[in-house]
Amino acid sequence: RKEYLLFQKTLLNNNCNNYYLNILNLNKIDNLIKKIKPDFIFHLAAQPFVLKGYKYPKWTYDTNVTGTLNILEAIKKNKIKTSIIVTTDKVYKNDERKKSFTETDQLGGDDPYSSSKHICEILVKNYNDIYFKNTNINVVTVRAGNVIGGGDRGKNRLIPDFFKTKKEMYI
């Protein structure tokens, strides 16, 4: 995997373990959690491309929604005390304003990617209200925007597209 090369170059692989598996396979997720007994889960797995969501809506919903549901089930079954589920700033209703969103702004993803991530937030709220209330299990969501990582060479991605232009940037 090309994206794994950056992970190795930064030597992060010397300080932590990294596992690749299919987010749709609950049994593999559950078996891995039983094996490694993590202190926390940091869930970033996703189909992260807005435009691919239009082209492949079922894959987008399966990966993002069912994948998150599988993580929540594994958290519940294995009683993982702390978990962070990463969603996106795309969950906000895009009203074309020229200012940053706030936590209290209206939600409303209008495409498969955005709405799938909004559904993930609803799932986390439901699990917190139904299954994790009055327990020591804490699951939160965070909304990230324009996440970049090793191997991110996708089309129509802000940061990779900027570097492809090979122009100077003034700040």
Model region roles, listed by residue range:
Residues L123-N126, D161, T165:
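Generic recognition of well-ordered alpha-helical segments
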Residues R1-G150:
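N-terminal Rossmann-like NAD(P)+-binding domain of SDR-like oxidoreductases, especially those catalyzing
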Residues H118, T135, I148-D161, E168-I171:
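Glycine/proline-rich active-site loop of Rossmann-fold NAD(P)-dependent oxidoreductases
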